[in-house]
Amino acid sequence: MAASPALDVPPEPPFKRRKTTPEPPSQMDTSDDSSAPLVADLAEQLDAQERKKYIKGKKLGSGQYADVFEAHLISDTRKLVAIKKIKVGPEVKEFGISYDSLREIKFLQELDHPNIIKLYAVFSTKNQNLNLVLEHLPQGDLLKLIQDTQSISYTPADIKSWMLMLQRAVYFCHANGVLHRDIKPNNLLIAANGEIKLADFGLARAMADPWQPMTYNTITIWYRPPELFYQAQHYGGAVDVWSCGCVFAELIARDVLFKAWPENEINMVKLICEKVGTPTEENWPGVTKLRGYLAPEIIPVKSKDDWIVAFRSIGELGVDLLIKMLALDPRVRLTAEGVLRHPFWTSDPRPSKLENLPKKGGGAETMGESLKQRGGELPRDGDANGSGGGRGDKVARKIDFGAMK
């Protein structure tokens, strides 16, 4: 594979997926029903052993879906972790585990990358609450950092560094056949050293066979691409690239790019048409055949000059990359690898070093607030910038669980 322009290094090759659940010995005879209680007892013992490794500390966040606690290892009080206790809901009572939890555990066990949050262990409690032992990321999230315009300033070099870390995580997911489907600033947590970590894999899924339909009612609405508003049921990594483009624009402008209010599909499509252009057969062949297609008003696709006026601070190459990440036609939109190969990364200014990045993204409590949310929610704080009220419940989350859709 040719070298990537991103920091003059090749895109990171797919790491081997971790196999964290041991397979039963091949010689085990499961036909004898008398072994079942022994296996169950062993599982309970192992679960108890794992649970007893940690001492829970203060609660960092609490929501309808989960509570998040700071904790440390009994064997080493300096080793901090975050324990996400997922609350028992209707699907837990029916299936034994929530859909989102199953997705998150599955993919975090498989994906091991410096820019993806680490899952250290999983254990349950007697009341069936599932506990995920996650990497402790004490600097909060990118959303709080973006919103703190009073005390935090950052540069194009900082934006380049954050986006590069995000793109490496997304490239790694896609190279391993995983779509994240909920990329947004409050799912980008900040480690003590300034590294960005992609979190919340509750809406993730494996890339499907081209003929297998997938749900279109996914991805937090402000970061959802037009093909999903048009009810496309066959899609790939382009949906994540659009979300990354939205994050890129938000970092530059310090405001949400597609902030429709009231937040519904029709208003979102109108806003995308206003800011990017109306999808038509000329710029997106086949779009009118999508069953959810609507064109409130035909608005020409914005020129590069229009984009430069709005995002001049990131430079011409940065604007070029942004335009290609937010291409209306998902077949024209850059792939995650294509994003990493763009010359933006090696142009001046070069990405900031970790030690020079702003790190005050709200602290450990913000990590808790981010981790407690269910996938697809907008910030539960309030106004359109996420600083007050709680409109996350209005975001549609009809997840079709058939075939892990």
Question: Predicted segment positions?
Answer:
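Protein kinase glycine-rich loop
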Residues: 56-64, 68
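Glycine-rich ATP phosphate-binding loop
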Residues: 67-90
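Short beta-strand micro-motifs within the conserved protein kinase catalytic domain, predominantly
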Residues: 118-130
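Conserved short submotifs of the Hanks-type protein kinase catalytic core
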Residues: 128-141
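Activation segment signature within eukaryotic-like protein kinase domains
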Residues: 162-163
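C-terminal lobe substrate-recognition/regulatory segment of protein kinase catalytic domains
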Residues: 278-323
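C-terminal intrinsically disordered, low-complexity extensions immediately downstream
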Residues: 350-405
